[in-house]
Each structure stands twice: as C-alpha cells, then as structure tokens.
C-alpha cells in the first residue's frame, strides 16, 4: 500500500482535511468525502452509525483499489477481471460497508 493511501485513509476516518497529488479528503458538515482525481470514491457520514459508503466511480484501476483498501473495513481484490469486496463480487457501484 502506498503512503498516500495510508495517509489519506487515516485523515478520512478521522474527518480531517487532506490534499496531496491526486487525492483529497473534504470534510463537510454531514459527511467526509475521499476523492481521487476529483471522483468521490468514499463517504463517511456523520450519523450515529458513522455509515461508510464506497464506489469505484467506474474506474477499476490499481490506484482506486489501493486508496479504498487503505480504509478500515474495506478489502478489495480482483480475480479474472472481477472485483471482490470483502469476499463478495462487487460491480463498483455505491455500497454501504457494514462494520
């Protein structure tokens, strides 16, 4: 895992602003957003459950996978061109992650 992925995930989970190269964490009133090349790939809502939602925004790249894998509770791997999220086939569309 690249250092930028680790650093951005740490800031994302702690709701702290971050910007380096192509990766940014934006903290809003109700949600913290992780962006990669301007695409919003993860959301952490400021609700009681601290809901975490992710998407690959249609970009099945190693960089997208690396940024998402750095987030606690997210494990993405690829087999025969199919992405698997926490052990289940995943189409990359927005999904809530259960803790």
Q: Which residue ranges define each predicted feature?
A:
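Terminal leader/tail segments of proteins
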Residues: 1-99
